[in-house]
Amino acid sequence: DGTPTDADVRHAIRAAHALGLSVMLKPHVDLWNDPNHWRGEIGPNFSNAQWNTWFAAYQRMITHYAALAAAEGVEQFAVGTELNTTVSHEANWRAVIAAVRAEFPGALTYAGDWTNAPDVPWWDALDLIGVDAYYPLAAAGNNTPTKAQLVAAWQPLLADLASLSAANGGQRILFTEVGYRSQNGAAQHPWDW
C-alpha cells in the first residue's frame, strides 16, 4: 500500500514547522486494490452491518493519526477526505468526530469533494467547512478562458459557498484542496489530472 510510515509523517510535519509553516494533517483513504474506483465510491452496496464495520476500522485509523497530529503540534486536522458515499451516515460520523476530538485539540474539518460538500449533514460538529475546490470554470471547448471569464465563473460558486456557510451558522469555509494544471483545458476539468 502507499501509506507513509508514522516516522515519515512526523518528519514531514517537523520539516514544515521548522520552515515556519502551519500544518493540516489530512489523511486520505485510497482503494489500492480497486483502481477503477476512488475513495468517493466506497461501499455503495454495503449493508448497515458492513457500514458499522467500516466506520469502526476507519475510526481506529483516523484517531491514530489524530493522536500523532496532536503529539506533533499540528494546527488543523481533517477527519476525512472526499468520502462521498459515507457522508449520509451521520451518527457514524458524529461518533468518529467525537473520538477525534478526544485525541486532537486543534481545529477540525472534513475535506468535502466540491460536488458533495453541500450534502454533509454534520458540518456543525466541526470547526471549519472544508471543500476540495476543483470547480470547472470554463465551458467545454474553451481551453483558454480569459481572466474576466474566470472571475465571472467564480461568482455563482462564491454565492453557493456563502449559502453553505450561512446554512451552517456562518461557519468559515476552508479550501482544503484547489488546483488547476498549467495546460490548455485545465479550467474545464481541474480534477482530471
Model-predicted regions and their roles:
Residues 22-29, 75-88, 96-118, 170-178:
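Aromatic-lined carbohydrate-recognition surfaces of secreted/lumenal glycan-active proteins
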